[in-house]
Amino acid sequence: LADYVSCALGRKHALKVKPITRQDLIEQWLDQFREMLEASATIGLPPFGGVHDIREAVRTAVPPHCLEPEELAIVAETLDATHAIVNWADSLNEDAIQLKTLCQSIGDFKTIADTLRRIVDGNGEVRDDASAKLRSVRTEIANAQIKIGHVVDRLLRDRHVTRWLHYPEATFHNDRLVLPLAAEHRGRIPGIIHRSSDSGATLFVEPAEAVELNNRIIELRYEERTEITRLLLHATRQLFLNHQAILETLDALAVLDLIVAKVRFARNYELACPQLSSDGTLRLYAARHPLLIEMQKEAQKRSEHRDVVPIDVRLGDDFDVLVITGPNTGGKTVAIKTVALSCLMAQAGLPIPANEGSTVPVYKDIFVDVGDEQSLQQSLSTFSSHLKQLMIMLTRAKPTTLVLIDELGAGTDPDEGAAIGQAIVRELLQRRCPAMVTTHLGALKSLAYVEPRAENACVEFDHKTLQPTYRLLIGEPGTSNAINIAQRLGLPPKIIAVARQHLSESHLQLTRAIRGTLQSRRQAEKARAEAEAAKRQNEKEKIAAQRELHALQEKKKEFQKWVETVSSLRPGDRVHVRRFDRSGQIVRVQLHKQMAVVNMGAVEMEVPLRELSCLPPSND
């Protein structure tokens, strides 16, 4: 996110982004993002060119301390840039309530910026014309330097003088122009000896003819420094008098830049703004893991093809616990990581890697146990480490907690692991705690058939290619497919037959029971998905219709305002003619022709009324 900001102000904010649990504040952040996304499509993103983090300079702008010219140049550039951002904010749609509220804190400091620019230029140098006094002093310095130059040039053209010098060049000592006289020719050039070289072989002499001129330049340099200090103090005082408003503006610009970064981030990763659900229901449509999206983009740069398979996930509507089963490397872990990231991003006020219409609750806690987190220092086994994490989760499990567990029951005897896994799932169900768990233990599948608030899911497996498709199928338990895969890979039929004989009767009964309900479950899931898709489409069309209606109403208001304005036009009124970008004066109005005759200086022209806008009366 920090890579998508426009300036250092936004970067500092982006690096502090983290999930929170205040729903009102999350709603505000997401509304700001939505409004910026819409604004970017109509008036573009705010122009941040020239904005710098000048907060430290503004804080230290306390007389008698003076800011340096380089600092003032950067401050001027930043304050000048706020003028363009204020103009951008004035163009926002009336519906952009959050952005308009934020931009009310952005002041227009163009007047102060102009004051600073009259003192320092863009390179951080004090301008010659910063004041009449400074121009006069610098002009006199330049003239005195020219006169000294003439004196030195004349001396260096004298071949006797050049023989007395160690080298035929003038140099400076304490702002005084001196000549490098060889010590053996001491006294040959009338003047003042200011110093000698370390060896004593060279004496640095100020020619007598240049002494008065050098004295005058030193006096003028002092006057120059005094005047510059006065000017810098004046500029610093302007900042001091407005420092609170400027700091508030910079804080608002930092937030605005962060919102812009979110929009750029969303465009690059194809993210969407989630809705916050009030009933605790989680619905993710076409969710993708951001790192997989990044890997896909990197592959495209190398002209390689890489698919990112989206998943649809729901939780909390007709079930609280989703048990994802199936073989390893099938995408189970990626699924729960995708859900975890989507929820955390939403609660940080960020767009999420899912489609429009996705809804996310505000969880008070999100617990994730993924992979082997055993601690060598505590000498914990894989299972012990896993169990320790689960115990922490269970103490905090409640309806506002999201629990995500990878490979529940792993790391120990499969039967005992499955028993513990079932007990943990039942505890989560009893607490109405929303959870997603992955496992390769088949015994956990049966829970969904006896617990009404539990549901199975699997990562789809292509039996033809013997590869997972990575699609998440809710309502269908997964299978390891180990025997089928072994058979397709050519394991001898005799061994396959023996392997099937070793399958337990309970396993076979469960498999037959699952197969018997699978078709009806698929049909029900398909019907539910189609109904939800239709509902989302209706919502999308409703929102689009409301926006179109609002746009028409705004145009109607503008038209009515224009009609009222045009109807009130009288001879002598000042108007702006858009076609020529010039102002003029109404001579007469021809409402029947929707035209007006306008005097624009030397000419009178007949202009369509639609090209006119009223101007305030002239002060003349």
State where each predicted segment sits.
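Long, charged, glycine-rich C-terminal linkers/tails
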Residues: 156-173, 261-286, 355, 455
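Conserved amphipathic alpha-helical "coupling/scaffold" segments
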Residues: 1-137, 242-263, 270, 286
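Amphipathic alpha-helical coiled-coil segments
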Residues: 26, 30-33, 40, 47, ...
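Conserved core positions of repeat-based scaffolds
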Residues: 450-455, 459-620
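Extended, Lys/Arg-enriched charged tracts that mediate electrostatic binding to polyanionic substrates
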Residues: 135-186, 255
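Extended, charged alpha-helical "arm/stalk" segments used for dimerization and assembly
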Residues: 1-37, 51-58, 194-200, 208-215, ...
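ATPase nucleotide-binding head domains, primarily ABC-like/P-loop NTPase cores
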Residues: 269-270, 277-517, 521
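SMC-family hinge/dimerization module
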Residues: 169, 173-205, 214, 276-310, ...
